[in-house]
Curated annotation (Swiss-Prot):
EC code(s) of this entry: 2.7.7.-
pH dependence: Optimum pH is 8.06.
Protein name: DNA primase small subunit PriS
A single GO cellular-component term on record: primosome complex
Amino acid sequence: MNTFAEVQKLYREYYNFAIKNNILEIPEGIEYREFGYGYLKKVDNRNLSFKNEREYKDWVLKNAPMHFYKSLAYMLYPNKSGGASKKGIFRRELAFDIDVHKTKKCKHEDDWICKHCLEEAKNQAIYLIEEFLIPDFGLNEEDLKIVFSGNRGYHIYIKPRDEKIRDIIESYSKEDRRFLMDYILGKNLNLNSVGSGWRRRLIKAIKERDKRISTKKLENEKNWKKVIENLKSKNKIYNIIEETKNKIELDEKVMDDDIRLLRVINSLHGYTGFIVKPLSGLDELRRFNPLEDAIFKDFENKVYEVNIFDDRKFEIEICGKKYNNKSKKITASALLYLFGHNIKFELLKS
């Protein structure tokens, strides 16, 4: 069996289902969006545009991309090449991209995934929402769109229900977006004048790390530097501050780049075969298990006999089934994952 042809067939099957059931994202203002796609690479081509929803769906059904992206920006000339200056950008969605690396608990290479790094990505998404977006930015849960990225991350879109506020946010300049990113990453944190948001966050972190450290003098004090320098525990406090600043792994380019592309919601991720899945809110996010909930269930009913001859030792668990380099039978879900990670194998039959 031709492996690449079979993979393409599976992607086409999924997109037929997604379009028939109206779950594939139709980006707002579709005629003003740039699209990109890839097969063996993330982006083989971009500067693609569609006049309407029908043209968009027809293209997806015909091409069944393994990686599929839309621009966050709205453009007058989305199909023009030559960078942002050529595209006539007049508006841009605001989204954060959490993209974690492997954790200390992970036993795999950095390009692999497991329950530990997926759990860390989830925890970081919850932390971003509960520690920044709601208390510091004044947003409600209903103002956010939470999307599993299809790999080790989450996309958090800022979508205020108040149209006037949304108009303001989606008109932010690159400098405005950079300020938000720097605030969350603590890059503009000044210990001589700590604002209420970071004060609350750091006090909570200190108490969680070491209950022996008294935070009473810090709770109503802006000038933390002055107080900390006179404490015996100052080195430990400075370490906790740095750890707290580095608690979220955000892809800064998603905020910086005017013409950044983000994966189309309910497309498939070409490295994993997992669904780029939207979640209804924090409750679903807390329950969410990508290794089960981001899998196209029809793929679990397709089983292939394989010969895996890759030298690397690996293991992946999908929908409760474990696969490794000794596996002789794999589901279509596992097939897409192994193919996306360049594991060497041949299909014998299905």
